[in-house]
């Protein structure tokens, strides 16, 4: 007899090795799957692969009328089972096809659209109905017929510049999307000569330029770096070619009025390793964190300087600025070791060190670089701002590149977190750090919840810095669904509204709040077209008779 709502569920006997943590496995879960485990950075292993729309998403609380724009998130999610190379057992969590989630806020309502970025890689595999690509950034593990295609999945970040909405991943150039339908429109819209473009370009609040770089800019495992600035009209106005000290993983950067500062992680790409079927990247405990300072508008690579610190990973920056002494100040997350254990070291000795060290310590810190000093100088130890695992810091982007006060940071909430987890797998809250006041407020997402990178929307165009709303996706692990929480920065500890999706979406890597004012045709177009004011049935077919 099937259990009623008041009865305990009927237990199904399964081998202990296959039992889920809650002790019950549904019979269909015992059937073989063509999908390998495909984890994201948060540790989730379930592909979602959803494309579609939701009109007027269900909301708890009240959406502030001041929210006028779109909250975009981009996520890695495999459109096809990633089994081509070794059954997918070596797949990296940062790989997977880019899929964009868009929450459109207007007049206190929210519509939702989700769609894959139709990259060349996506189109190849969609036509084939199977996986054709192997390891992350290793074409030697791809099917021979696709090795000369651009294998970027455009899954890392989005930005709006010069009226163009871009989806980006650092192993290729950007794809352009329609900001309303999310249809893919083209590749490399600014015609950059580099083979690659960072997923973390910065929009200068002073000049309006999009400032960025590409690394491995002339091909696999090359040390070539390309610096560029694109003005608000879409024209490249500054560019410079330079070389990194080694072929390093250069994910994020910091911007000041006079410098672009690159952060080199201690990984190294090696062509021989790739040809042998190994990973693009290997962590190296003998290499230091390295910073490259590029004077904005520089005409010669001789103007570029390098700086070093200990081993570790400054993963993402909040922002950068210059103090009254001309020193560069950068606030960033910092992991004291390898935060990407899926790219282990080459040597057995270093692999043993990674294993024995366990989960590396993570913090939010402040770096100081004096660009007047000689190149190749070791930096002083950074100042610790938050001594708790911290990642994905964001600011009020109206102050990008200049001195700022407020930072919004993904954190492990003190006393409510498991500090033994990888920094990406225990982020259960947000911190509002007020630099000038020296204070920190905490928002806790709730039990059995993880929270993703925040974004900030100012209360008005002329609102004081940090006065507005923070939005972030909360993964409700207990309910297997996702929701956007909205926090008023005037009372940071409590959400004022939650936009509740009826399902879970993948853990995103990055996202942006794009105001309606800078989105082309924002008022005339929506994420979802409204039905035409034309009825299929004439009034005579209605059951209502106005004469009765």
Curated annotation (Swiss-Prot):
Domain of life: Eukaryota
Its EC number(s): 1.13.11.-
Keywords for the protein's UniProt record, in alphabetical order: Dioxygenase, Iron, Metal-binding, Oxidoreductase
Disruption-associated phenotype: Does not affect biotrophic development, nor virulence.
The protein's required cofactors: Fe(2+)
Reaction(s) this enzyme catalyzes, per UniProt: trans-resveratrol + O2 = 3,5-dihydroxybenzaldehyde + 4-hydroxybenzaldehyde; piceatannol + O2 = 3,5-dihydroxybenzaldehyde + 3,4-dihydroxybenzaldehyde
One record GO biological process: carotene catabolic process
Residues that coordinate or bind trans-resveratrol: 136, 169, 391
Gene Ontology molecular function terms on file: carotenoid dioxygenase activity; metal ion binding
Binding of piceatannol, residues: 136, 169, 391
Metal-binding is among the record's keywords: yes
UniProt cofactor note: Binds 1 Fe(2+) ion per subunit.
Binding site for Fe cation: 200, 251, 316, 510
InterPro entries: Carotenoid_Oase
Family according to the record: Belongs to the carotenoid oxygenase family.
Physiological role: Dioxygenase that cleaves the interphenyl C-alpha-C-beta double bond of resveratrol to yield 3,5-dihydroxybenzaldehyde and 4-hydroxybenzaldehyde. Also cleaves piceatannol, a compound that differs from resveratrol only in the occurrence of an additional hydroxyl group, which leads to the production of 3,4-dihydroxybenzaldehyde and 3,5-hydroxybenzaldehyde. Exhibits a high degree of substrate specificity, as suggested by the lack of activity on carotenoids and the other resveratrol- related compounds.
Name used for this protein in its record: Resveratrol cleavage oxygenase 1
Source organism of this protein record: Mycosarcoma maydis (Corn smut fungus)
Gene encoding the protein: RCO1
């Amino acid at each position: 007899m099937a259990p009623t709502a008041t009865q305990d569920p009927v237990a199904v006997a399964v081998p202990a090795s296959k039992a889920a943590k809650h002790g019950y496995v549904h019979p269909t879960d015992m059937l073989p799957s063509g999908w390998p485990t495909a984890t994201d950075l948060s540790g989730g292993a379930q592909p979602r692969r959803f494309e579609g729309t939701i009109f007027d998403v269900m909301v708890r609380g009240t959406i502030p009328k001041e929210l006028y724009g779109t909250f975009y998130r981009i996520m890695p999610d495999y459109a096809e089972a990633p089994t081509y190379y070794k059954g997918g057992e070596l797949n990296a969590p940062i790989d997977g096809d880019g899929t964009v989630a868009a929450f459109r806020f207007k007049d206190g309502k929210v519509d939702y659209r989700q769609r894959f970025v139709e990259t060349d890689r996506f189109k190849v595999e969609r036509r084939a109905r199977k996986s054709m690509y192997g390891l992350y950034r290793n074409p030697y593990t791809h099917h021979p017929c696709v090795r000369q295609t651009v294998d970027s999945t455009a899954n890392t970040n989005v930005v709006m510049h010069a009226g163009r909405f871009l989806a980006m991943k650092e192993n290729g150039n950007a794809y352009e999307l329609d900001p309303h339908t999310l249809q893919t429109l083209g590749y490399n819209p600014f015609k950059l000569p580099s083979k690659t473009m960072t997923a973390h370009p910065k929009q200068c609040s002073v000049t309006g330029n999009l400032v960025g770089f590409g690394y491995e800019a002339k091909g696999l495992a090359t040390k070539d770096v390309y610096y560029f600035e694109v003005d608000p009209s879409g024209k490249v106005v500054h560019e410079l070619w330079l070389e990194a000290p080694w072929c390093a993983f250069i994910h994020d950067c910091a911007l000041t009025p006079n410098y672009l500062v690159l952060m080199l992680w201690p990984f190294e790409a090696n062509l021989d390793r790739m040809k042998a079927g190994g990973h693009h990247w290997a962590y190296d405990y003998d290499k230091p964190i390295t910073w490259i300072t590029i004077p904005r508008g520089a005409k010669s690579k001789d103007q570029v300087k390098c700086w070093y610190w200990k081993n570790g990973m400054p993963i993402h920056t909040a922002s950068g600025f210059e103090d009254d002494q001309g020193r560069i100040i950068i606030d960033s997350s910092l992991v004291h070791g390898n935060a990407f254990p899926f790219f282990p070291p080459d040597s057995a000795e270093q692999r043993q060190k990674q294993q024995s060290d366990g989960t590396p310590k993570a913090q939010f810190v402040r770096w100081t670089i004096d660009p007047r000093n000689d190149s190749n100088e070791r930096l002083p130890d950074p100042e610790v701002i938050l001594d708790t695992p911290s990642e994905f810091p964001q600011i009020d982007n109206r102050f990008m590149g200049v001195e700022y006060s407020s930072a919004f940071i993904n954190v492990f909430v003190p006393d409510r977190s498991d500090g033994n987890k990888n920094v990406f797998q225990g982020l259960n809250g947000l911190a509002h750090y007020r630099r000038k006041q020296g204070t920190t407020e905490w928002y806790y997402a709730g039990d059995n919840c993880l929270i993703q990178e925040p974004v900030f929307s100012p209360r008005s165009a002329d609102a004081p810095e940090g006065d507005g709303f923070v939005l972030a996706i909360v993964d409700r692990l207990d309910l297997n669904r996702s929701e956007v929480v909205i926090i008023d920065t005037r009372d940071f500890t409590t959400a004022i509204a939650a936009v509740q999706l009826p399902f879970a979406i993948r853990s995103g890597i990055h996202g942006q709040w794009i105001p309606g004012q800078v989105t082309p045709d924002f008022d005339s177009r929506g994420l979802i077209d409204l039905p035409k004011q034309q009825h299929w049935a004439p009034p005579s077919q209605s059951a209502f008779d106005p004469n009765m």
